[in-house]
Amino acid sequence: EVIQATKIISKAINAKGIVFVVNKTFSKMEELQNCGIDNSRILIINNSKFPCGFKREIINEFNKSLKKSLPFRVSKNDLFVDSSTMYDVYKSILLKLPSIDKMVHFTGNCIYSSCLLNVKLGTSIKDIVNQIGGFEKNPSLVVINGNQTGASVSSLDVPITKYTKSVS
């Protein structure tokens, strides 16, 4: 789905090239290598270092490893899109489904088990936590979108938005 959406977006904006950024444990490397998109490359980021995945780090890593092998350059002015957004593009364009839900990863040592849920936009974190069995113990902090780059929430009444990727 992500590859199909990438083809659609790259054609729509007349992209000179595509760089897929993945971590070293990415399991579908062969699919990306055989995606059929001209001037596409895979950039493997070491996500054990902090920070990782920001535009600046991606550009720096690109300049170190791929710059010489491609007929295009990457800069902060280019389009950077994450895989969940590309999945939403796929659902909207190819399946004709509006974006009314979001895949959200719930994890942490205060819930009984980690899970990836398809959540309706606007649903509160509190409602979702109740649906997955509540808290095993009271959390000292709840963070949206990762411990390294995310933001803590002041209340569990905060809704899931189109920008929410994870809750921990």
Residue ranges and their predicted role:
Residues E1-I13:
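Histidine-anchored nucleotide/phosphate-binding helix
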Residues K16, V21-I125, I132-E136:
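Hydrophobic alpha-helical positions that pack around
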Residues I3, K126-V129:
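Generic structural signal for individual residues within well-ordered alpha-helical segments
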Residues S10-K11, K96, P159:
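A general structural signal for short secondary-structure junctions and capping/turn motifs
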Residues K102, G134-S168:
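Ferredoxin-type iron-sulfur electron-transfer modules and their immediate structural context
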Residues S10, V129-N130:
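Residue-level preference for well-ordered alpha-helical positions
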